[in-house]
């Protein structure tokens, strides 16, 4: 009898594993809930043929998928940031295209030591399908489809992300790359209001920074945007807070300047969020993070005059072994920033290691509405004497730009070969820098960070208007209103999981393994409020973003809820193995 019970128990257990409920997980390709070919075809037809089945971009360089001409094209284009931004098969930070191991990867042909023709291309974290939406009705159709089939939904804007939020295994992607509307308003009146808020621009979800900058050049305006030209203007940059390294000091954060959102919610409704309508959603989208509360189809943002600016640059250089580079040089540059901030002049400090034997730090100051080059030179030189006393090599350059937009980059970046990045950042409070030894303390701490030859460390100047806008209620951590700088370290890495960094405060440049993300990014009170708004607008958590509001309820990839039982987890593993085989 016992001999019989063994096989019967195994059969019963196997039957249970096969048919165990998967309601706590998103549907995956090996499960019966996965959309049929007919389902995908119907969605494609409703979108005028803009649904595509995708493979990693380098698949044409591997195994049976190899195509010589297509592979050569990938090798040529793979370093182009603009190409990566518009391509649903790629991300900017390449490390997030792969899985946890090299066996879950699909590298391009230029990667050294990798045998492409004889190796298979693995999907990794690249979604299985991408919908290239062209209208709000397309977005609504995709949201309904994802809801109906319980799919893991991801949104790809430009793919700039330090935690891989634009992709996930076995997922369905909505790409914003065709939503390029740009409309300029002389005096924007938000819906539900009778009062104009001055000049503004409405941007579609797929507009990149360089595109709105170029439009601004033609129409004599600028916006509060980031420095990287291929970052999306409406996506996670804006919804995550939006920091400009130079302009935030005089114009605030991006979320301080957004006037209205148009949002497709998780039940596929199209709603407006501003100070008059759906105020809770408006608050959440002003710092609560992208891809979390709904699909932002467009946003309207305040614009500023394209005024002249005089840019003054001071560069110091020293040998790596010269400790005075940090203790005196960098410390003095921080003092200079503080001095000019007190005169309402913003600045950014950038530290690099141009060679293995040398260090370099550059301070760039922006004198707005100033064209008197001689005056700026005198102001700068009057503050540089301490650097010369310490025999630190110093050079300066002052140049006048007729328009502030001349300083904005309107060309996509070209990355170095085999280049991937991780980033970490931390806020430095104004109170810390104003202490007697505050600048020395910060310089000393920065000197302890290992800076490689392809790494870059830079400050984003806060304070100023960011502090003055304290009355504006946003969902970012309250510490932003008290900070003097955001300090960011960007490190070059190979595309592997193991080299990812830690310890940050800005979600847009955050640690993908941050355990205390709720407190670090938003603070206890703000997070509780955000969680309640998330529960109202997205009760089934369709919009799930890594280290985003509500993500603590899910596994790392947003596939299964953490409350999934042992039996259900084992069932999922067995199904996956059968699907692979």
Curated annotation (Swiss-Prot):
Gene: easE
EC annotation from Swiss-Prot or TrEMBL: 1.-.-.-
Swiss-Prot/TrEMBL keywords: Alkaloid metabolism, FAD, Flavoprotein, Glycoprotein, Oxidoreductase, Signal
Highest taxon in the source lineage: Eukaryota
One Pfam family, short name: BBE
Family: Belongs to the oxygen-dependent FAD-linked oxidoreductase family.
Species name: Claviceps fusiformis
GO molecular function, one term: oxidoreductase activity
Gene3D superfamilies: 3.30.465.10
Glycan attachment residues as annotated in the record: 44, 73, 369
Lineage: Eukaryota, Fungi, Dikarya, Ascomycota, Pezizomycotina
Annotated signal sequence range: 1-25
Gene Ontology biological-process entries: indole alkaloid biosynthetic process
The FAD-binding PCMH-type domain, residue ranges: 122-306
Pathway: Alkaloid biosynthesis; ergot alkaloid biosynthesis
Protein's name according to its UniProt entry: FAD-linked oxidoreductase easE
Known role: FAD-linked oxidoreductase; part of the gene cluster that mediates the biosynthesis of fungal ergot alkaloid. DmaW catalyzes the first step of ergot alkaloid biosynthesis by condensing dimethylallyl diphosphate (DMAP) and tryptophan to form 4-dimethylallyl-L-tryptophan. The second step is catalyzed by the methyltransferase easF that methylates 4-dimethylallyl-L-tryptophan in the presence of S-adenosyl-L-methionine, resulting in the formation of 4-dimethylallyl-L-abrine.
Cofactor: FAD
